[in-house]
Each structure stands twice: as structure tokens, then as C-alpha cells.
A protein has these predicted regions:
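Short terminal alpha-helical segments
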Residues: 2-49, 95-107
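Low-complexity, intrinsically disordered regions enriched in charged/polar residues
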Residues: 12, 16-19, 23, 58, ...
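Extended amphipathic alpha-helical scaffold segments
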Residues: 22-30, 65-75
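Charged, low-complexity interaction regions
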Residues: 31-42, 57-65, 79-85, 107
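Short, charged, amphipathic alpha-helical segments
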Residues: 43-50, 65-70, 85-89
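Extended, amphipathic alpha-helices with heptad-repeat/coiled-coil or helix-bundle character
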Residues: 47-58, 68-78
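Amphipathic alpha-helical binding modules
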Residues: 75-108
Length: 108
């Protein structure tokens, strides 16, 4: 008996775009935190941002959402530079959009 191995299908264009945008927003946030050290909690925020960008989180968006909540809580308690706050808002908006697309079946 010959068994054929199944292959996963390639993500749709929308899925690639929204996930790429989300990854880019996390990279922006990480860069802003790293370039503006010194505010209260910056090292913890950087650590958890790296965690959110890990393969485990990318493959489990609910885990990424939990990590975003943690990062947001750390940053909102501190007097962060404007660039950090703007990148945090972008990550939050794209996370919401990505989770909505996941819930509606637009991405898996």
C-alpha cells in the first residue's frame, strides 16, 4: 500500500499580509524599546516583546495576545517615549484585526 503524504496549503494573501503586518509592528515596538532604555520596566517589556515574537507565539495567536496584555500593562505604568506608545498602539490594533480575521475564518 502506498500512502501519500499530505501537504499544508500555503497561506492566503490576506493571511500573509496581516501576519506580516503584525510581525512588523512587534519589530517596531521592540526597536523603540531597545533604542529608548531607562524607563521603568523597559527590560521586562523587551523580554516579553521577544517572547511575543517567538515561534511559539506566532503559531499560537492567543498566547501572543496574552503576552501583548502583559507588555501593555508594563508600558502603561511607565513614562514611555512617544515612539514606544505609538508602536504599542499599532501592535494592539493589528492584534485585534488578526484575531477578528481568525475568528471569522479569514485565516487559520
Amino acid at each position: 500500500m502506498v500512502r501519500h503524504m499530505g501537504f499544508d496549503t500555503e497561506p492566503t494573501g490576506y493571511e500573509k499580509t496581516i501576519l506580516s503586518d503584525l510581525q512588523g509592528a512587534w519589530q517596531c515596538l521592540r526597536r523603540e524599546i531597545a533604542e529608548n532604555p531607562g524607563f521603568d520596566g523597559w527590560e521586562r517589556a523587551l523580554l516579553h516583546t521577544d517572547e511575543a515574537m517567538s515561534w511559539e507565539s506566532v503559531r499560537n495567536l492567543r498566547q501572543m495576545q496574552r503576552t501583548l496584555l502583559l507588555v501593555r500593562n508594563i508600558l502603561q505604568r511607565a513614562d514611555v517615549p512617544q515612539g514606544v506608545a505609538e508602536c504599542l498602539e499599532e501592535v494592539s490594533a493589528l492584534m485585534d484585526e488578526t484575531l477578528a480575521a481568525l475568528a471569522s475564518g479569514e485565516i487559520d
